[in-house]
Amino acid sequence: MENQFLRTEMVLGADGMDALRRSHVAVFGLGGVGSYAVEALVRSGVGELTLIDDDTVALTNLNRQLEALHSTLGQSKAEAIAARCRDINPAVVLHPIVGRYEAAGRERFFDAKYDYILDCIDLVSCKLDLIETALTRGIPILSALGTGNKLDPSQLQITDISKTYGCPLARVMRKELKARGILHTRVLFSPELPAATEQKEAPPPGRRSVPASLTWVPGCGGLMMGGEAVLDLARRAKEEAK
């Protein structure tokens, strides 16, 4: 019987693949970073995915988001990317949630047990609460710290928040997390200085500007995050088997 994950199993082994099939990963935010993270997860054989975003596919998403096609314009991002996942792996268990993660309604998003969380949310207040909630509940979490206005994907790094530098969002997150008593959490960040940009659209409520974004930087960041989750889950299974 053919196995679509055979090439992955050659690296991660049968035990690693079994661990992935039994794993439940939640991805919060399905934009340029989150959509590529989902792609890495589903193509690697993760068995259960919760996909969370409150937005719909818009024309300006076509330059960087995997669920964004002319045929999906106006559809919910969560449902659109879930359809893509089903086509990649019909056996995957999917929970698309159309909604925005906020502290006031967090329990809606935690009615299932997650083995890993990928935080690809834009809003700082929501990121802070999600990180605190995950750490309090003992759920591994990896957070994206912004890929907008960046040109060079080779500068992307996954490290502890305490080791970040040169990133304005990382600076804000370090300060706000410290105020909550959190000094350590895993993040994806880039020290690259933001590129000069020209504003072409009005910012949504609560934001001062719309960040420019390219295909390859958020895409590479999302693949890195998805890959990190896959390797962590497979590695943990090997350690538990010893």
Residue ranges and their predicted role:
Residues 46, 51-89:
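Glycine-rich phosphate-binding loop and adjoining beta1-alpha1-beta2 segment
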Residues 97-106:
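Conserved SAM/SAH-binding loop
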Residues 2, 110-113, 121, 125-126, ...:
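Glycine-rich phosphate/adenylate-binding loop
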Residues 1-26:
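N-terminal charged helix/coil linker that caps or initiates catalytic domains
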Residues 33-34:
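Hydrophobic/small residue at the entry helix of a nucleotide-binding pocket
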Residues 27-29, 52:
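Conserved N-terminal Rossmann-fold NAD(P)-binding element of oxidoreductases
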